[in-house]
C-alpha cells in the first residue's frame, strides 16, 4: 500500500474517534408523548363498587341465570356483625336476613324525624343513628359524605357554607345523632 492510502485510513480513524469523543456520556432517551388517561375520568367512577372479579361468580352471559343478587339489608344495631357478601370466605347464606341500612333509608328517616330541640337528652329516641356507623360511612363512602354536607350544611343549596347555616344545622344534627356528637 502506498503512503496516501495509509494517510486516508488514519484521517478516517481520527474522524471516528473525534465523533465518538463528542457524543454524550449517557444514552439519549427518546421523548415519548404522554398517553391520555383511559377509563373513567372522575374518582367516584374509578372507585365504584360492583366492578371487577368479585362482582358476581360468573361474568359470562350463559351463567347469568344462576346469579341471584343479595337483597339490601336494613341496619339493625342489635344484630350480629354485618359483613360484605362474596368476599373471601363469607357467603350470602348467612343467617342475618335484615336489610342494609342505605342512604335512601337514612334520608327518609331524617325527613320524618321531628325537631327535638326542646326535648331532654334522657329520652330514648328511635330516630337517633349509631355514631360508629355514621363515622364509618362518612370515611368510606364519599357519596354519603357529600349528601350529608348538602343536607346539613348547605341549607339554601348554593354550595357555600355560611355561619348561620352551620349553627342551625349543628343543633339539628345533635338532636338527631344524640348527645355524644360534639
Curated annotation (Swiss-Prot):
Region annotated Disordered, chain positions: 51-72
Location of this chain's protein in the cell: Secreted
Domain of life (superkingdom): Eukaryota
Gene Ontology BP annotations: neuropeptide signaling pathway
Keyword terms of this UniProt record: Amidation, Cleavage on pair of basic residues, Neuropeptide, Secreted, Signal
Residues found modified as Phenylalanine amide: 51
Bias type Basic and acidic residues, positions: 52-70
Propeptide: 23-37, 55-182
Signal peptide boundaries: 1-22
Transmembrane segments: none
GO annotation, cellular component aspect: extracellular region
Function, in words: Neuropeptide stimulator of juvenile hormone synthesis.
Name the UniProt record assigns to this protein: Allatotropin
